[in-house]
Curated annotation (Swiss-Prot):
Gene assigned in the entry: SPDYE1
Protein name: Speedy protein E1
Region of interest: Disordered: 16-50
The keyword Transcription appears for this protein: no
Associated disorder: SPDYE1 is located in the Williams-Beuren syndrome (WBS) critical region. WBS results from a hemizygous deletion of several genes on chromosome 7q11.23, thought to arise as a consequence of unequal crossing over between highly homologous low-copy repeat sequences flanking the deleted region.
Entry superkingdom: Eukaryota
Alphabetically ordered keywords of this record: Williams-Beuren syndrome
């Protein structure tokens, strides 16, 4: 074993013989050159990561909305190093990528130009209209202003119904303006617009339905409001209150004490006769008509999405459509 090692050492130590194996000579030289170059070049510090920046997007009063803006990690030093390593007259990009590279460079130039220009604030979307209602010291009360839905066709339907003979007699009868002053009639037009029916569909019944509902909202005089049935269904409806009165008297007289006391029997018979007399076919018919009227009034109220209150601003806007109309002269302030 010692002889073999001595011969091997002698062969490798002979002059003119490369001690390294032939297969590793080229790789060894490259590795040594790369290690020498790496030792000569100074170690470069890593570029710090770009930090996030925030820019002002919108400014409204004392509130400010911030928007995050990303900063590109590519610096001018990277472009200089890239251009210095390029050989003169040699296109660094492959032939099949030259057109895309040009587009990319053009887009980069445009993006740099756009960054230099000031950023434009986006126009806000249209919001609801708010008007100043009251200003007291440093406090201001804002009120949202609704756009009126009354159209000219609703005014035309209202004017057409004013030509109805029954409505004419009703307005002429109400001289004290307890049921049909200018504000209540303006509410009728507002209800026509909220109900959503076509203008040709409004009839005499719809006029009295809207007027009855307006009196429910603004007035507390039930006796004057009941006169609407007199003009809508005729004079026979006058027996309906009497019917209710006689029925109440009959029930009151038929109490347990009255049943035991025979002296009240003639009175009970009298009340029963009065009840039958006032419950004639016409009275029963008018009573059913009033029940149907109340049912239709509820359906009309539901068709307006249960919005029966009308603001004074909307009433003034309705009257301003035709200020010379004779209906708007029905003002209670002029009577006093």
């Amino acid at each position: 074993m010692q002889k073999h090692y001595t011969v091997a050492w002698f062969l490798y130590s002979a002059p003119g013989v490369d001690p390294s194996p032939p297969c590793r000579s080229l790789g060894w030289k490259r590795k040594r050159e790369w290690s020498d170059e790496s030792e000569e070049e100074p170690e470069k510090e890593l570029a710090p990561e770009p930090e996030e920046t925030w820019v002002v997007e919108t400014l409204c009063g004392l509130k400010m909305k911030l928007k995050q803006q990303r900063v590109s990690p590519i610096l001018l030093e990277h472009h200089k190093d890239f251009n210095s390593q390029l050989a003169p007259g040699v296109d660094p990009s492959p032939p099949h990528r030259s057109f895309c590279w040009k587009r990319k460079m053009e887009w980069w130039d445009k993006s740099e130009e756009s960054e230099e220009e000031p950023r434009k604030v986006l126009a806000p979307e249209p919001e609801e209209i708010w008007v100043a209602e009251m200003l007291c010291g440093l406090k201001m009360k804002l009120k949202r202003r609704r756009v009126s839905l009354v159209l000219p066709e609703h005014h035309e339907a209202f004017n057409r119904l004013l030509e109805d003979p029954v409505i004419k007699r009703f307005l002429a009868w109400d001289k004290d303006l307890r049921v049909s002053d200018k504000y209540l009639l303006a509410m009728v037009i507002a209800y026509f617009s909220r109900a959503g029916f076509p203008s040709w569909q409004y009839q005499r019944l719809h006029f009295f339905l809207a007027l009855y509902l307006a009196n429910d909202m603004e007035e507390d005089d039930e006796d004057s409001k009941q006169n609407i049935f007199h003009f809508l269904y005729g004079k026979n409806r006058s027996r309906i209150p009497l019917l209710r009165k006689r029925r109440f008297q009959l029930y009151r007289s038929m109490n347990p004490r009255a049943r035991k006391n025979r002296s009240h029997i003639p009175l009970v018979r009298k009340r029963r006769f009065q009840l039958r007399r006032c419950m004639n076919p016409r009275a029963r018919k008018n009573r059913s008509q009033i029940v149907l009227f109340q049912k239709r009034r509820f359906h009309f109220f539901c068709s307006m999405s249960c919005r029966a209150w009308v603001s004074p601003e909307e009433l003034e806007e309705i009257q301003a459509y035709d200020p010379e109309h004779w209906v708007w002269a029905r003002d209670r302030a002029r009577l006093s």
